[in-house]
Structures are given as structure tokens and as C-alpha cells.
């Protein structure tokens, strides 16, 4: 039987929210089988818990935000991406702010935290959501789609009119049967343009942004002294975001995702349309490990 997984130990980190600029204390705690991923606002009395599920998605203009009543938790996608990438099913995530810490702008520090805590199997079957038919959303020149595939594959294309983007690949297809999430995706950082910075600051956004937690570009070049971590870091970060958004389905996806110039808003619309199209998916478990798509085998996920 392919089993659910949680952390072996409690692990903590501190950082700042990229939009609020506030200091955030983050604690990851093991959770029982069938709990799922639960965010807990421990700065509130009583504590408010928000499940990482599609029906709690709120604002998606700059990041993926979860809401419950008037309580919100912003920028959940990087941590969710890390949890999906290493295969954690059940977890309590305590935080003392309405936004997760941005860390270095990638999922790498979260992967390190998870690996530091250790992962343990639980005595309950892991559920997957398997795509049975294509579901697509198009909006002008943007599109997102999921379709059947016996594994986990993401294709993504971006299109920025900037000298640096023209030099680097703006399209990528990653099949996770042969691609290591940890090595080849998790360290891709979020990026932004200096030309947008003034507008963003005027609107009291990105108060915690810096060259330590984002790739920043002027009209011609990257301002970060260390340069790119991957030649295709820009499009890989978009893939990292997609993996986090997809994990709001509450289960690992068996299927293929394709996106063109999409962001969190279009991603969330696709998730809602998918779940509403009952004939397009099914929940599956695997008694026989040999039937599991290779992308989800322990060998592939820990590489």
C-alpha cells in the first residue's frame, strides 16, 4: 500500500512576509492521517484554522491567498509547492501573521525545513486525484489545461518582452518521472521588475521584498549579484507556483498540466472548473506499489 506521510518532528523558522514586511514565526507540526494540510493563525484568539483546499481560495492578484470569514493567509504557494514536491500529505502549519514568510523567494528553504524534520509514513492509504478528461480555460492570450497522463508533467510558457528573457528559455516541460523537484525546481526564485516597484510600494505592497528574496530586473539585466540559479529560472519559478496551486486539490495529481502566461487567478479558476466537472477526475489509491506512476515513487521524490 502507498501510504500517507507527515513529518517526524516539529520544525520552526522565522522570516518576513514579502507584502506585509512583518516578521513571521512559522511552525510545521505532524498531523494525523486524513488531516490534509491545515494552516493555523496562532496570533488570533481563538486560533483560526484554514484548510489548504480550493474552496478557501480568496484573493489571487499577487499570490495565492486563503480566506475563512475575514481571516486570511497569503502567499501559501511556495510552502505548498515544497510539500507537494516531497510528498507530505498531513501537516499543521502555525503562523503568527496573515502571510507566510517569503524566505529566499523559492521553495528551497521550505524543502530544507521539511527534510530537517524528517518524513514518516502513516498507516492510511495515500489518495491521488487522477485526471480522466481534458479541462481547459482560455482568457485572451492566456490558457491553462489539465489532461490525462499516467504520471505528473507540467508544461509552461511565459512571454516577457525583455532582453534577458529573450536570451533565456521562456518555455519548459518537466516530467517528474525524470526530473527532480528538489534539485531542478525548488530553488527557482520569484522575480519582479524594477519598473513596477514604485507602483507596488505606493500601494503598500512588497514591503518585505529585497534582493535577498526575489530576482529583480531593470531594463536590461538582473540586479542580483549571484545571477540565476538555473538558466531557465524564470519559467521554473512559474512551474513551482503551479505545483503549489495544484496542491490545493488536497491530493497529488496524476495528470498533465499545461499553462501559457497564466498566474494564480487562472490556475485557481481551472481548479474550480476541474472539481465541478465530476466526470473529469477520480480519486485513486494504490495497494500495489508497482502500479504507482514513477513520478510518485520514493526514489523519484527524494532524488
From Swiss-Prot:
Chain segments annotated as coiled-coil in the UniProt record: none
The protein's Enzyme Commission number: 3.5.1.108
GO molecular function per UniProt: metal ion binding; UDP-3-O-acyl-N-acetylglucosamine deacetylase activity
GO biological process, one term: lipid A biosynthetic process
Cofactor(s) for this UniProt protein: Zn(2+)
Binding site for Zn(2+): 78, 237, 241
A Gene Ontology cellular-component term: membrane
Catalytic reactions of this protein: a UDP-3-O-[(3R)-3-hydroxyacyl]-N-acetyl-alpha-D-glucosamine + H2O = a UDP-3-O-[(3R)-3-hydroxyacyl]-alpha-D-glucosamine + acetate
Domain of life: Bacteria
InterPro entries the record matches: Ribosomal_Su5_D2-typ_SF (IPR020568), UDP-acyl_GlcNac_deAcase (IPR004463), UDP-acyl_GlcNac_deAcase_C (IPR011334), UDP-acyl_N-AcGlcN_deAcase_N (IPR015870)
Active site residues of this protein: 264 (proton donor)
Pathway assigned to this chain's UniProt record: Glycolipid biosynthesis; lipid IV(A) biosynthesis; lipid IV(A) from (3R)-3-hydroxytetradecanoyl-[acyl-carrier-protein] and UDP-N-acetyl-alpha-D-glucosamine: step 2/6
Disulfide bonds: none
Keywords, comma-separated and alphabetical: Hydrolase, Lipid A biosynthesis, Lipid biosynthesis, Lipid metabolism, Metal-binding, Zinc
Statement: the UniProt record of this protein carries the keyword Phosphoprotein: no
Family: Belongs to the LpxC family.
Functional description taken from the UniProt entry: Catalyzes the hydrolysis of UDP-3-O-myristoyl-N-acetylglucosamine to form UDP-3-O-myristoylglucosamine and acetate, the committed step in lipid A biosynthesis.
Annotated protein name in UniProt: UDP-3-O-acyl-N-acetylglucosamine deacetylase
Gene source species: Coxiella burnetii (strain CbuK_Q154)
Species lineage: Bacteria, Pseudomonadati, Pseudomonadota, Gammaproteobacteria, Legionellales
Amino acid at each position: 500500500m502507498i501510504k500517507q506521510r507527515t513529518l517526524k518532528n516539529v520544525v520552526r523558522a522565522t522570516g518576513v512576509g514579502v507584502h506585509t514586511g512583518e516578521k513571521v514565526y512559522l511552525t510545521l507540526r505532524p498531523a494525523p492521517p486524513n488531516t490534509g494540510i491545515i494552516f493555523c493563525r496562532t496570533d488570533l484568539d481563538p486560533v483560526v484554522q484554514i484548510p489548504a483546499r480550493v474552496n478557501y481560495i480568496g484573493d489571487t492578484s499577487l499570490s495565492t491567498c486563503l480566506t475563512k470569514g475575514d481571516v486570511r493567509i497569503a502567499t501559501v504557494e511556495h510552502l505548498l509547492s515544497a510539500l507537494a514536491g516531497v510528498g507530505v500529505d498531513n501537516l499543521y502549519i502555525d503562523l503568527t501573521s496573515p502571510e507566510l514568510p517569503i524566505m529566499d523567494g523559492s521553495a528551497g528553504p521550505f524543502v530544507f525545513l521539511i527534510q530537517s524534520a524528517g518524513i514518516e509514513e502513516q498507516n492510511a492509504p495515500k489518495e491521488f486525484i487522477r485526471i480522466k478528461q481534458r479541462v481547459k480555460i482560455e482568457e485572451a492570450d492566456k490558457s491553462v489545461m489539465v489532461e490525462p497522463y499516467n504520471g505528473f508533467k507540467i508544461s509552461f510558457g511565459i512571454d516577457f518582452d525583455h532582453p534577458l528573457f529573450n536570451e533565456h528559455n521562456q518555455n519548459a516541460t518537466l516530467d517528474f518521472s525524470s526530473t527532480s523537484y528538489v534539485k531542478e525546481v525548488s530553488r527557482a526564485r520569484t522575480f519582479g521588475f524594477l519598473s513596477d516597484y514604485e507602483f507596488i510600494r505606493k500601494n503598500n505592497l512588497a514591503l518585505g521584498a529585497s534582493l535577498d528574496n526575489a530576482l529583480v530586473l531593470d531594463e536590461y539585466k538582473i540586479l542580483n549579484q549571484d545571477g540565476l540559479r538555473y538558466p531557465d529560472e524564470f519559467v521554473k519559478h512559474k512551474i513551482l507556483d503551479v505545483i503549489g496551486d495544484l496542491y490545493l486539490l488536497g491530493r497529488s495529481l496524476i495528470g498533465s498540466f499545461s499553462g501559457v502566461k497564466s498566474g494564480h487567478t487562472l490556475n485557481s479558476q481551472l481548479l474550480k472548473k476541474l472539481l465541478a466537472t465530476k466526470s473529469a477526475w477520480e480519486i485513486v489509491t494504490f495497494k500495489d506499489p508497482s502500479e504507482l506512476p514513477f513520478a510518485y515513487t520514493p526514489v523519484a521524490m527524494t532524488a
